[in-house]
């Protein structure tokens, strides 16, 4: 509730079986095309929250993400602890850098969706994001999928992601996870078998 005045969300407050898929992208190691293939197969929209170097290193992937109907969101230029940033100018720089890179690659303005690195924030951060026109999205379901040399097994991933899913969940997955690349198609099928449907965060930002 304290987040709502700042246009910030952890989840959708609903009893409907809706899932909002999001991916945090720090760099590319070959999994994003697999993720996009699975999303396309299931006609599932997603938001990819990217840092600056992800755009500059992977312009073709950015174009594919957009052309397949997904949204590219802002995960800051350099992935700092944003709660330590107290000046609007420094805060704006972190977001504008990404937005400018995105526009240079796509020719379009970036959707103003923001996710703070590691979910760390201060109330003044949330106010600054709102003042800059951003909707801030945290998450209600995630698992430890980002450690490269300790990737969860398929069974571990399913156990965590299937048992903890809930109506209105904003799901955070990392694009760098080999496990996610391998299981996403099957995971989406399993959620569909549980009568969940995939929705875009655009719906939340417009309520």
Q: Which residues does each predicted region cover?
A:
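His/Asp/Glu-enriched short active-site or ligand-binding loop at hydrolase and phosphoryl-transfer sites
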Residues: 120, 125-164, 196-207
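Divalent metal-coordination and catalytic microenvironments
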Residues: 24, 39, 72, 114-117, ...
């Amino acid at each position: 509730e304290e987040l709502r005045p700042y246009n910030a969300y952890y989840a959708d407050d609903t009893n409907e079986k809706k899932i909002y898929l999001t991916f945090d992208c720090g760099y590319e190691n070959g999994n994003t095309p697999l993720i996009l293939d699975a999303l396309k197969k299931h006609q599932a929209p997603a938001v990819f929250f990217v840092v600056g170097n992800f755009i500059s290193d992977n312009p073709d992937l950015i174009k594919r993400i957009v052309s397949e109907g997904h949204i590219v969101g802002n995960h800051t230029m350099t992935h700092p602890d944003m709660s330590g940033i107290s000046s609007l100018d420094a805060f704006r720089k972190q977001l504008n850098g990404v937005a400018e890179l995105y526009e240079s690659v796509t020719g379009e303005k970036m959707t103003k969706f923001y996710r703070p690195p590691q979910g760390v924030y201060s109330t003044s951060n949330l106010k600054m994001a709102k003042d800059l026109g951003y909707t801030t999205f945290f998450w209600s379901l995630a698992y430890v999928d980002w450690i490269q040399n300790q990737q969860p097994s398929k069974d571990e991933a399913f156990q965590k992601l299937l048992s903890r899913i809930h109506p209105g969940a904003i799901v955070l997955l990392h694009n760098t996870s080999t496990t996610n690349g391998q299981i996403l198609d099957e995971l989406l099928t399993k959620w569909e078998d549980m009568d969940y449907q995939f929705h875009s965060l655009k719906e939340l930002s417009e309520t």
